[in-house]
Amino acid sequence: RAPALSKEEIISFAREWDPQRLHTDEAYATKIHGGLIASGFQTMLQAFKPVMHEMMPKIANIGGLGFDSLRWPLPMRPGEALAIELEVTSVTPSKSKPDRGVLVYTLRASNPARQVVFVADPPVMIRRRPSEEK
């Protein structure tokens, strides 16, 4: 679960990182989106925070490899906590480096109405367990 963001947090983040009026000017955002919305980048960070704090320390993460896909189907709004779902979709051993592999997972974040506001498929390089020789 990712905590809700306040209007002030959304505006503060947007002023520094994504200063579009739809994230900083509530009156303007209301005309277009029915109210203030969070930057997609802030939504992504909210979705990834539990993953980085809870999952990544438990796996032998070497580093991220980018995103196979990244979407914001709906905006995140002030006061909406996000439900986070993670599904591992593939694990592939490296052909050139036997001590590592690539794990791909789908990360979904949904608002309280269970509508998806963020979905991504990031591949991650991970260490493999040593195989036992017989």
Predicted segments, located by residue:
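HotDog/MaoC-like acyl-thioester-processing domains
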Residues: 72, 76-81, 85-134
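Hot-dog-fold acyl-thioester-processing enzymes
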Residues: 1-66, 129-134
